[in-house]
Amino acid sequence: MSRIEPAAVSGNVFQQMMGHRPGIMEKWFALDESMRFQGLLSPTLKEEVRRSIADGIGCRFCASLGAPDPDSHDRRTALAVAFAQTVFDNFHDLHGLDDEVFAVLKEEFSDAEIVELSIWSLFMIAGQAFGALMQIRPSTAAELDDYKDWRAAGEAAARDAA
């Protein structure tokens, strides 16, 4: 059971929980879509980052949208996922992250890509922490299908724009 009742707005239960503050919800999801489907890093890499931290944070809704697929990770994706997990695990002391973490990232990523990865990881941690805090239930089958369709359309648009 969620800590608060979902707002009477359209969308999935996560959107409905944020829907108590419509202006924030609209901007949050616009930022999500912009970062997810635009930028230097692929939407597929970003999705693996999202999936990799969902279980650890405890957002049941977020985790129900797809489990990580470590078998599909190339070196860049594996490094991105490891970085996001390291950021999450050390969130209480981000100053304490060893410089070696960034040295390894720089073997595969440009500075601009590291910035994008850092912002994406922290944005996902924040959103998923909200889901965990509100104890949002797992997605329904229809919500999962809608999420998959939304991702597929966004990824296709990103490919067409490239």
What are these regions (language model features)?
Residues 1-162:
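Hydrophobic alpha-helical segments
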